Design a protein with these regions (language model features):
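Conserved catalytic cores of phosphodiester-cleaving nucleases, focusing on short active-site segments
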Residues: 457, 481-485, 493-501, 515
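Structural motif
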Residues: 173, 493-497, 529
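Active-site metal-binding core of divalent-cation-utilizing nuclease and nuclease-like domains
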Residues: 163-168, 465-491
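Mg2+/Mn2+-dependent nuclease catalytic core
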Residues: 193-198, 501-518
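Phosphate-binding site recognition
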Residues: 1-447
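Metal-dependent nuclease catalytic cores in nucleic-acid-processing enzymes
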Residues: 202-210, 362-370, 458-463, 511-531
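Acidic-basic catalytic patches of nuclease active cores, encompassing PD-(D/E)XK
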Residues: 437-471
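Domain-level recognition of nuclease-like catalytic cores that cleave nucleotide substrates
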Residues: 520, 526-550
Length: 550
């Protein structure tokens, strides 16, 4: 066993299985039943890409633990779902697996590059990639004599694998994690990228090295690079965030899986909170939750943003500061809850060839900053911010940009909060009416209280970020107040908001008083502002009355 050939070292899937009584564990081993059907078929080349922290590495480790001769998988899988499938024993630990983690290869190459003494023919990352695999194959008791006979050198991975396959009549399983590292970390090195993709094309083309593999599995963040609008590895069946296919349930947590997680006595967070914070990736009609964030929220009993994407955050900053007309406004609108239609038809699946806003949104979907839903045209997608976690990340990033305070939406939000503080009901009514009449509010939902609540929350979104938390339908006094803005620090007033339809703002204010919504907060806050907002379905006018309680 080595680090690449039949690795038996640290395996995140095995560690998770062993700790399943104390950690969140969702059995995704049904995925193995899917891959078992692909063996030695024209579907044996499979690429699945997803954003960071979507379980890609755990899944790759699961494949390795199941197929590799380097593991004793019976004890790992015997109580999991795959053990109930007819194909379970047929493939269990029967294959020589070549497992490549490109992050590890890149790190080792970095150390190699600093050495004075170099290996002949190993000059760049692609050479080192080949050399690392060949070195382990040469050190194997099974393959060493064959490779010695063929006088295999330090590079030439294709001829190495062909020699083994032809002489020993054996096939490998090839698993590559972070396949797209060359396109992300070396995004401006076009020569290295072309050398890398040429190597993979030769390995996996039908008249090349494809016969060396019973199954090949690539995973990463970016879809397979396109050249001249065609996939560079067109023999692969590819499934990504823009075209997820049938593998959506195996990456991320589904609604049913979340329901089981919250049933555990160890789970102290609610299904609704998990949904608000981490769901929203609708992949092929399946609601998907970010699995890494769910696990952290459950283990820490707190739903906050656990998004870890420092390098991709930098990429987001670069993308929203491009000169494409309207991109900043679109990002602000997305954060506020609107949707944007875009085309992914000409996206080249890299981080450099960004030609227009369509490519920006396509890349942001692949990175996980946006969700997308399908339309009748397979290339036309509808982008949206998927959940509170991503919304919080995007808001923090946007607020750091030098153009932030110049945006009309931000000015409007500041003016709305200022008007509430100054008890200026006329201005509040005007701003809410502007939002209500904007494209952000669906005509189908225009005349319901939900849309009015949305208008106020959207209007106050940016101006209340630092000083307020908000609650809807909060139990207070003798009933539930529609909307509460509770100050994080004591210097700001508490804001209670009640809505009416075809009534009056005076009625809304009277309800706050007669139902004594404020009593719950008496003693906590010295200043309480109450806001009554009415909308007339006949006149389409908004009315607002604001008072400060003594």
């Amino acid at each position: 066993m080595g680090n690449i050939l039949n690795p038996g070292n640290d395996n995140s899937f095995i560690n998770l299985v062993k700790a399943r009584d104390t950690r969140v564990f969702v059995d995704k081993t049904d995925f193995l039943e899917k891959t078992n059907t692909l063996f030695n078929t024209d579907g044996k080349l499979l690429a699945v890409t997803r954003p960071r922290r979507f379980g890609k590495t755990v899944t790759a480790h699961m494949l390795s633990a199941y197929y590799s001769k380097g593991y004793a998988g019976q004890n790992i899988f015997d109580k999991l779902e795959i053990a109930n499938r007819a194909s379970f024993a047929e493939h269990l630990n029967k294959y020589d697996v070549i497992y490549i983690d490109m992050n590890t290869i890149d790190g080792l190459f970095d150390g190699y590059s600093n050495k004075k003494q170099k290996v002949e023919g190993v000059n760049d990352l692609v050479d080192y990639f080949e050399y690392s695999i060949i070195k382990e194959l040469k050190s194997s008791d099974i393959f060493s004599k064959c490779l010695e006979k063929h006088q295999i050198e330090n590079t030439g991975l294709l001829e190495t694998l062909l020699a083994i396959t032809q002489d020993l009549n054996t096939k490998f399983i090839f698993i590559m994690d972070e396949w797209d590292l060359v396109y992300r970390e070396y995004c401006n090195d076009e020569a290295l990228q072309k050398k890398f993709i040429k190597l993979l094309k030769n390995l996996f083309k039908a008249d090349g090295g494809q016969d060396c593999f019973a199954l090949a599995y690539l995973t990463g963040i970016l879809p397979i690079k396109k050249y001249n609008s065609q996939s560079a590895l067109n023999d692969f069946d590819e499934y990504n965030m823009l075209s997820p296919g049938d593998y959506a349930p195996y990456f991320g947590f589904t609604e049913d899986e979340i329901a089981k997680i919250v049933e555990s006595p160890n789970c102290k967070v609610s299904h609704q909170d998990l949904k608000e914070w981490y769901e929203g990736y609708k992949i092929k009609g399946v609601d998907i939750y970010n699995p890494n964030s769910v696990c952290k929220a459950v283990s820490r009993s707190e739903c906050i943003s656990y998004w870890s994407g420092t390098s991709s955050n930098e990429e987001f900053v670069r993308l929203i500061n491009t000169d494409f007309k309207g991109i900043k406004e679109d990002i602000i609108n997305l954060i506020e809850g609107e949707q944007v239609t875009f085309s992914c038809a000409n996206f080249q699946n890299d981080m450099v060839t960004i030609k227009d806003k369509n490519d920006v949104f396509s890349l942001l979907v692949c990175l996980g900053y946006l969700g997308c839903s399908d339309t009748k045209n397979k290339y036309r997608k509808v982008a949206y911010v998927p959940n509170a976690e991503i919304k919080a990340v995007l808001m923090d990033i946007v607020r750091e940009q030098n153009w932030y305070e110049r945006m009309e939406t931000i000015k409007r939000s500041d003016n709305l909060l200022k008007a509430i503080m100054e008890l200026d009901g006329t201005t509040v009514a005007r701003v809410i009416q502007e939002i209500h009449n904007s494209s952000a509010v669906s005509l189908l939902d225009y005349n319901d209280e939900e849309s009015l609540t949305y208008c106020v929350m959207t209007g106050l979104l940016w101006s209340t970020l630092d000083d307020y938390s908000y609650h809807r339908e909060d139990q207070a006094g003798k009933g539930r107040v529609d909307l509460v803005y509770e100050p994080i620090t004591g210097k700001m007033p508490l804001i209670l908001i009640e809505f009416k339809y075809d009534g009056s703002a005076e009625e809304a204010i009277a309800q706050i008083k007669t139902q004594e919504y404020f009593k719950r907060y008496t003693g906590q806050y010295r200043n309480i502002i109450i806001v009554g907002i009415n909308y007339s379905t006949k006149t389409k006018d908004h009315q607002c009355l604001i008072e400060k309680l003594d």
